[in-house]
Each structure stands twice: as structure tokens, then as C-alpha cells.
């Protein structure tokens, strides 16, 4: 199941374990770029790449073996340190996160696309920060 962060017209935030949210509210959720993987964008949703093609929000720390849970946790933790340091100084990652937050506030339905989900993914950190900003 996917966690969707929704912004109501009053800019309140709710989280739900639904795969798709109905109505005109904006939201952001994680999706997977692999062919046949779950979480592909549905009609009315906008895909935003957050893999390494995105030089700002992509995780620059390479996971050499996607089945190595320890290595996955390590690259996510390294991204966490870099991400929170960037947020603290209003760097480019903070600006990109705020831009996504504003898009959700205006009602856009965004699917943050990476190769990891539903396995642990750095995208969860980005979504959690957007959720915090919407509260």
C-alpha cells in the first residue's frame, strides 16, 4: 500500500494508506520506475523523478546490491544527513522540496518516482518533509 500525503484546500494534511486519493485535493506519493512495478502514475497524476537523474533530489549514494538491506539502510542514512544539512541552510534540496510542497498545495497530484519503492527509499524522507511543511 502507498502512503499518500494530501493537502486539503485549507492546507491541512492527512495521510492515508490508499493507492489513490479521490477529489480535487493535491497529494504526493512514491512510485516505482521499473517496468511492471506497482505505483505507476495514474490519470491526473504528474510523475516527478527523484532518482539520480534528478541532480537535486536524487540520492547520490549508489546502492550496488539492491538486495543488501544493510547497504540500503546506509545509503538512505547518508542521504538523510545530506538532506537535513541542506534543509538547515536553505540549500537547493530545500528549495526543490518547497517547490513540490507548493505544487501539492495548489492541488497537483504528484508521484515521486524512484527505483526503490516499495523497498525502503530516500524518497520517504522527502515525502515526510513535505508532510511536515503542509501541517
State where each predicted segment sits.
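Catalytic phosphate/metal-binding cores of nucleic-acid and nucleotide-processing enzymes, i.e., regions
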Residues: 2-135
Amino acid at each position: 500500500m502507498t502512503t499518500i500525503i494530501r493537502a486539503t484546500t485549507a492546507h491541512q494534511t492527512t495521510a492515508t494508506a490508499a493507492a489513490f486519493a479521490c477529489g480535487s485535493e493535491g497529494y504526493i506519493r512514491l512510485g516505482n520506475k521499473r517496468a511492471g512495478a506497482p505505483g505507476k502514475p495514474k490519470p491526473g497524476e504528474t510523475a516527478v523523478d527523484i532518482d539520480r537523474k534528478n541532480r537535486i533530489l536524487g540520492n547520490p549514494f549508489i546502492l550496488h546490491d539492491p538486495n543488501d538491506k544493510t547497504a540500503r539502510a546506509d545509503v538512505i542514512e547518508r542521504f538523510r544527513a545530506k538532506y537535513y544539512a541542506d534543509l538547515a541552510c536553505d540549500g537547493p534540496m530545500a528549495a526543490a522540496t518547497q517547490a513540490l510542497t507548493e505544487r501539492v498545495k495548489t492541488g497537483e497530484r504528484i508521484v515521486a518516482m524512484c527505483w526503490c519503492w516499495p523497498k525502503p527509499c530516500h524518497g520517504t524522507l522527502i515525502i515526510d518533509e513535505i508532510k511536515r511543511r503542509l501541517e
